Amino acid sequence: MVISVATPRRSIRDAVLGGVLGAGGRQLYQPLRCAFYDGAAGGGLTAALSEDGAEGGVPLPCGRKTAAAKNVLILMSDTGGGHRASAEALRDAFRLEFGDAYQVFVRDLGKEYGGWPLNDMERSYKFMIRHVRLWKVAFHGTSPRWVHGMYLAALAYFYANEVVAGIMRYNPDIIISVHPLMQHIPLWVLKWQSLHPKVPFVTVITDLNTCHPTWFHHGVTRCYCPSAEVAKRALLRGLEPSQIRVYGLPIRPSFCRAVLDKDELRKELDMDPDLPAVLLMGGGEGMGPVEETARALSDELYDRRRRRPVGQIVVICGRNQVLRSTLQSSRWNVPVKIRGFEKQMEKWMGACDCIITKAGPGTIAEALIRGLPIILNDFIPGQEVGNVPYVVDNGAGVFSKDPREAARQVARWFTTHTNELRRYSLNALKLAQPEAVFDIVKDIHKLQQQPATVTRIPYSLTSSFSYSI
């Protein structure tokens, strides 16, 4: 089965130029039409699919449905590990809650269907993160509405046709964005095709506090915020209260519903059963002062007067093989476990008593679920800056960029300040939202069940594209 999509390139370019460079985006445009489908009929995306198709149409092998299954298309990009992790958490929650009622596709439309720079965002992001000043300029420089509006309009001008093909391939009944740049063009495509009344489009924000303004689009059916702070930002950006829900950051079900026993875990992981343990992480890429902090911990967790350790260390090096090799060849004063990229972090977190990590939202949310006091030792400028006060102000941890001071804090918690460690642990558990991913998919299911969900997309390309220059 194929459908034939009328080529939108010229019409889309005309509309983008009209919306951005003239008339302030106030013109009304006729929707593009799929063959065998009248967009004005309001039949939704499913109704746009035909049993037959003209030659040269777009094949739809991925979007075929079982008898009553609904297709969910989750849009993401591998700019950092958090977006994919949230997307896969949502996918797994749909399967657990609704079984075969939904087919879930996790896709990077930019990489699969777009050209530069959409298909190169992962490499570009990693380069800028290694040069944090460059990333800081990029983050704040694109925050003004007119700047990112022009940028997104240019992307729509060149790649909207490809986005149409990508969306149509998966025949979605629901579209979920877990990335700030995976909203504007797809939303406008839905509006252009007259499909927005039947296809709920929701955003799941994956930053705990400070968010780039491109996260907040007026046209979404629902905006799921991980915290009250993010919800306030959404309101300031013009979203309606009816569009906003605060459930927490989606964490994979295998983590948030795992029932773990610390003693059993330490036995399984070959750890000392009697010594308190600190988990040291640098994210998936092993970034930050991991080596310096590990060596400081080795010194501070060794009682030289009694000649015995007062704690043990678990270091997660991620994909950083150089770091892992360096640490494995080192001598230590205390028991140390050196690990690479781990897929079962629930076990290592469950076996430890506190964590030292950079301020990544996913790691913070997981640590809170496990009740681990957090020492934040680094952050990415822009989106991770606000995660520090989120943890510190809620009494779930402390911040220190000095490896030696972080190690001393752990030593105090493990010896003379055990009550403080317990207090931080209780505060972490209070701040945790382990059911967030299930609350989100249940709410999306309710949206899909409604007879006529309307995404509030303006007739201009998007709210970000409408400017007079």
UniProtKB/Swiss-Prot annotation:
Residue stretch of the organelle transit peptide: 1-42
Origin organism is Oryza sativa subsp. japonica (Rice)
The source's superkingdom equals Eukaryota
InterPro entries the UniProt entry points to: Diacylglyc_glucosyltr_N, Glyco_trans_28_C, Glycosyltransf_28_UgtP
Q: Sorted alphabetically, which keywords does the UniProt record give?
A: Chloroplast, Glycosyltransferase, Membrane, Plastid, Transferase, Transit peptide
Pfam families documented for this protein: Glyco_tran_28_C, MGDG_synth
> Which reactions fall under this protein's catalytic activity?
a 1,2-diacyl-sn-glycerol + UDP-alpha-D-galactose = a 1,2-diacyl-3-O-(beta-D-galactosyl)-sn-glycerol + UDP + H(+)
Name of the featured protein: Probable monogalactosyldiacylglycerol synthase 2, chloroplastic
Q: Name one GO molecular function term.
A: 1,2-diacylglycerol 3-beta-galactosyltransferase activity
Q: Its GO CC terms? A: chloroplast membrane
**Could you tell me where this protein is found in the cell?**
Plastid, Chloroplast membrane
Q: What is its EC number?
A: 2.4.1.46
